């Protein structure tokens, strides 16, 4: 029987990643099928899977680097969060990355008693309670305009349930899972588009998978898969919201190297260009996600803030027609002069004029 320590140590984090990746891999099509918010592009399950895959790969790289020795827990937890950050896909994946980053900020910090700590707050279960609370609060802060009935609501319910539970880490994780699952069933009544479609929130559904995996890593008993999907109905094509009516045409995602001040200005700029704005990260590295009509303007805003790279642009209309098939790609050219920009534009590329790097 595998070891099931009542502590989120390095081995448990590795197991958590593995179990979560397996669960999302099994459920990704089901989650894709109920994806109707914020855009019905049928990719939430896939985006969550790819985000967790990047996190898992980062964790495995740490274990490889340590060779036959067991890695430091802090190194593994930070790697998980960093891997999710650089590999985050879509709105849901970006929020998941911030949830993991919030947890890592607590779980990877030195465990020292501080003035004002409540009894047990620095033990393993207490740290997990604080980590789940930090995860939820940091995710809300990352979203420009938080909406209830989404994975944010589910994350908060998980943190609330964990905070109200005594016992070890496994018991706290189980309470968080139960709280998240209960909150998930309430999402159709909180968000009208979910109620009309008769589904729960897709991002929240994926988060329940991730929390179920956490339970499995700490207790050795992962909650039954059939219980996680209770109340979900597949959206028929003739009932799905029209992707092309209302809302921006493009999803733009990129990694950005920039300082805190520049990112604060970028948030304001992007908030005026579109919606579904989520900016996650810190310490000079960020993942930027936004839905806009002018993809070039969103990228140019990133160039003004710092150094954007790994730029991805998805046209929602194309995603609707080719759901769960190969995503169409766009070409973005960063060019030094207007003449070259004109040539690239005529060839069908989105062009951005290069600017000197910011010094503040």
Task: Give the ranges of each region predicted by the language model.
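N-terminal loops that bind phosphate or other acidic moieties
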Residues: 1-360
């Amino acid at each position: 029987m595998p070891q099931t320590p009542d502590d989120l140590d390095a081995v448990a984090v590795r197991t958590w990643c593995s179990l979560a990746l397996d669960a999302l891999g099994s459920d990704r099509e089901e989650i894709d099928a109920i994806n109707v918010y914020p855009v019905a592009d049928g990719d939430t399950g896939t985006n969550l899977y790819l985000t967790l895959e990047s996190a898992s790969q980062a964790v495995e790289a740490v274990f490889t680097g340590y060779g036959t020795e067991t890695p430091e827990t802090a190194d593994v937890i930070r790697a998980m969060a960093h891997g999710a950050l650089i590999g985050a896909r879509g709105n849901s994946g970006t929020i998941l990355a911030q949830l993991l980053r919030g947890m890592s900020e607590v779980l990877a910090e030195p465990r020292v008693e501080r003035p004002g700590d409540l009894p047990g707050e620095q033990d393993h279960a207490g740290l997990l309670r604080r980590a789940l609370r930090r995860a939820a609060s940091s995710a809300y802060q990352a979203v420009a305009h938080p909406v209830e009935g989404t994975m944010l609501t589910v994350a908060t319910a998980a943190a609330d349930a964990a905070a109200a539970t005594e016992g070890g880490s496994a018991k706290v994780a189980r309470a968080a899972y139960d709280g998240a699952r209960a909150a998930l069933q309430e999402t159709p009544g909180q968000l009208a588009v979910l109620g009309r479609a008769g589904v729960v929130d897709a991002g929240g559904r994926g988060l329940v998978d991730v929390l179920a995996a956490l339970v499995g890593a700490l207790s050795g008993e992962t909650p039954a898969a059939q219980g996680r999907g209770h109340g979900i109905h597949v959206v028929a094509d003739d009932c799905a919201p029209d992707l092309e009516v209302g809302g921006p045409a493009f999803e733009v995602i990129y990694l950005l190297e920039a300082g805190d001040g520049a990112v604060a200005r970028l948030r304001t700029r992007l908030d005026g260009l579109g919606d579904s704005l989520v900016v996650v990260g810190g310490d000079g590295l960020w993942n930027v996600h936004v839905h806009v009509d002018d993809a070039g303007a969103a990228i140019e805003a990133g160039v003004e803030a710092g150094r954007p790279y790994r730029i991805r642009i998805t046209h929602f209309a194309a995603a609707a027609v080719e759901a769960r098939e190969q995503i169409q790609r766009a070409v973005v050219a960063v060019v030094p002069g207007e003449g070259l920009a004109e040539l690239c534009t005529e060839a069908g590329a989105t062009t951005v004029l290069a600017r000197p790097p910011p010094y503040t």
